Each structure stands twice: as structure tokens, then as C-alpha cells.
Amino acid sequence: MHIDIDWQNVDTVLLDMDGTLLDLAFDNYFWQKLVPETYGAQQGISPQDAQEYIRQQYHAVQHTLNWYCLDYWSERLGLDICAMTTAQGPRAVLRDDTVPFLNALKASGKRRILLTNAHPHNLAVKLEHTGLASHLDLLLSTHTFGYPKEDQRLWRAVTEETGISAEKTLFIDDSEPILNAAARFGIRYCLGVTNPDSGLAEKHYTRHPSLNDYRRLIPSLM
């Protein structure tokens, strides 16, 4: 799908964090490998049983705020998820195209707002290890509002909090259900990321334009 952004009529760019500005390899390793392994060892069950149990637990709360909540998973699984996140902090890395794109947005006068479903502790750890905050104008965790990006109430709350105009906003995310929610609210430009995890094959979007390198946007932006 062709990317057609009228940059003259965009004043705000909302950006997801994990998979969009940061390599999703961190989260995929943490939630798909480390958590099941740690839980299985603690419970004395096989890796296969641990994987299946964790998969069921994830599926039960998918697209809700609990899915992203470290406190919820600590209580649910009996693991210190916050401490585990802190220990894995050095694994968090920026995408190669993140800083050039954010710098270009700044140079062209666009407001750069992080909008992440990440738990505040998760966000703080990643900011510490990546320096991402210095390239953004505002950082928002949806936990502050009580709703994830999949929920229309979140979009209303963010609009009230930031004063953004949906008609003049570009939103970039690596989740099609979340892009759908943004489009439903009225965000004019919704753009998907095809390579959120540098170690996995690219993904495809059915309803939104997408790309694998933000540097492709810079010539039209400048």
C-alpha cells in the first residue's frame, strides 16, 4: 500500500516504542523465552508445559492493559517481573533508523510524542539504556490513563491531555489492531512497521500502509 503523507498538514507524530523505536527482539526474548523458562524452573515443570501455560495466560488478557502490566504478571506468575526487566535492561536497543527519523522530525518542526502501552518500569529501564527520551518532546505510558491503545477511551484521553488534532497526526505502530483503533478514532495517518524484530521475517498489514525503514520518509519530510 502506497505511503502518501501530506507533511504540510502534519504537526504531530505519535510513536509506539517496542518494535517501532526499539528493536522488539528484547520483548520477544523476555516474554517468549525468559519468562516461560524462569516460571518452568520455579514450578518444576517441563519447558513444554511452561510454554503452554504461559501462552494461555497471555492469550487470556491480550489487548487489555493487564497484558502490558508488570505488576499483573508478577502477581499472576509469582515472579519478580520488574527485577527481571531491570536485569535485562542492557538488551534494549534502538532501531537503526530511529534517531535519524526523530532528528528529521525535529528539524521539520513536528511534535514527537511517545505513546506506549509499556508499564512505567519497563519504560524507565528502556529509556535508561537507550537514551530515547532525548529525542522526544513528550513521553506517555497508557498506564497513566488506565486504558491501552486498543481502547477508544485512551484516544479521547490522550487528545484531551495533549491537545493534538487527529486530522493533523501521524501514528506509527507495529500492531495492526492498534493501528485500527487509531484509525477508528480518526487519526488521519496510520503507518505500520514491517520489521519490529530485527531477527524475524517481515510482517504484512492488510489495512494500513507500512515500511521497514523510516529513513525512506525523510526526503519527503524535509
PLM feature segments, named:
Residues 1-13, 103, 119-120, 124-222:
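Asp-based, Mg2+/Mn2+-dependent phosphohydrolase catalytic module
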Residues 3-100, 119-121:
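N-terminal helical cap/lid subdomain that shapes the substrate entry/recognition surface
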Residues 20, 116, 169:
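Ser/Thr-centric signal marking residues that sit
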Residues 23, 114-115, 173-174:
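Small/polar loops that bind or transfer phosphate-bearing groups
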Residues 94, 115, 147:
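Residue-level marker of regulatory loop/turn positions in helix-turn-helix DNA-binding domains and
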Residues 97-109:
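Catalytic-core regions built around general acid/base machinery
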Residues 109-113, 166-169:
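Short active-site oxyanion
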